[in-house]
Design a protein with these regions (language model features):
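STAS-like cytosolic regulatory interaction modules
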Residues: 1-51, 63-120
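ABC-family nucleotide-binding domains
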Residues: 54
Length: 120
């Protein structure tokens, strides 16, 4: 089972995932969550609490990457667990999935908060 929570800060959306992405239902749930964020400029998928990801989930990440690119949205993965990172490394040379570093994530959050406070 996959639980998803979305945090918005201005044009930044952080999609926090918890559980496993091993069945079609989980992959489709992830797709619905991410594609609902059409007005975001940056989408970060937090994988720190995802215990496993299988073929359908990996395929969905590739789909979401292409979807985001087509909508001029930056799509980044953040903090995948060791088991998820191992699976990602199998497809990453081909897919070029963007995995944000902690420093990059802190910078994204700081910039989003700054822009959000200026808009308020």
């Amino acid at each position: 089972m996959l639980a998803i929570r979305i945090e918005r800060i201005g044009e930044l959306a952080v999609v926090e995932c918890k559980g496993r992405v091993v069945r079609s239902e989980a992959a489709f749930k992830l797709r619905e969550a991410v594609t609902s964020l059409r007005n975001a400029r940056i989408i970060v998928l937090d994988l720190s609490e995802v215990g496993a990801i299988e073929g359908g989930g990996l395929g969905m990440l590739l789909y979401l990457q292409r979807w985001a690119y087509g909508h001029k949205i930056q799509f980044k993965l953040f903090n995948p667990t060791r088991s998820v990172r191992d699976r990602l490394e199998l497809v990453n040379p081909i897919a070029q999935l963007d995995i944000a570093t902690v420093h990059e994530m802190m910078e994204l959050l700081a910039n989003a908060e700054h822009r959000y406070s200026l808009a308020a």
